[in-house]
């Protein structure tokens, strides 16, 4: 447990001092617990999401960094994207089978920025309605169905 807390403290400082572009740690979210963070995000300039504001929820288990964090969009504005379900779940391989303890909150944030920035058309995943009706509340317990090369 102590190594998890040390790692989270280190990542928290890194996110506060050098956040990825368009990302800001919601300071209130970490006041009561170091195991649940909210990161405020703004869509990158020149993309379909330019100026849009989103929130990412990170939840860390006691096995972090050996287990990936649970990461999902939360709040009023969930991006419309082929790999983001309307309940906020994100289909991104580094959040599941491609996770490595060498990855960090910053690398997850950068991957999500990249995923949104490369989007050519705002649309939901093809199975959005079915998935949202039948999925587990924890996206880490999802067996993802791949619709293209990445998800």
UniProtKB/Swiss-Prot annotation:
One of its GO terms (biological process) is antiviral innate immune response. There is a cross-link at residue 1 (Peptide (Met-Gly) (interchain with G-Cter in ubiquitin)). CDD domains: UBCc_UBE2W (cd23808). Autoubiquitinated at Met-1. SMART domains: UBCc. Pfam families: UQ_con. It is found in: Nucleus. Belongs to the ubiquitin-conjugating enzyme family. Accepts ubiquitin from the E1 complex and catalyzes its covalent attachment to other proteins. Specifically monoubiquitinates the N-terminus of various substrates, including ATXN3, MAPT/TAU, POLR2H/RPB8 and STUB1/CHIP, by recognizing backbone atoms of disordered N-termini. Involved in degradation of misfolded chaperone substrates by mediating monoubiquitination of STUB1/CHIP, leading to recruitment of ATXN3 to monoubiquitinated STUB1/CHIP, and restriction of the length of ubiquitin chain attached to STUB1/CHIP substrates by ATXN3. Homodimer. Interacts with FANCL. Interacts with STUB1/CHIP. This is Ubiquitin-conjugating enzyme E2 W. It comes from Mus musculus (Mouse).
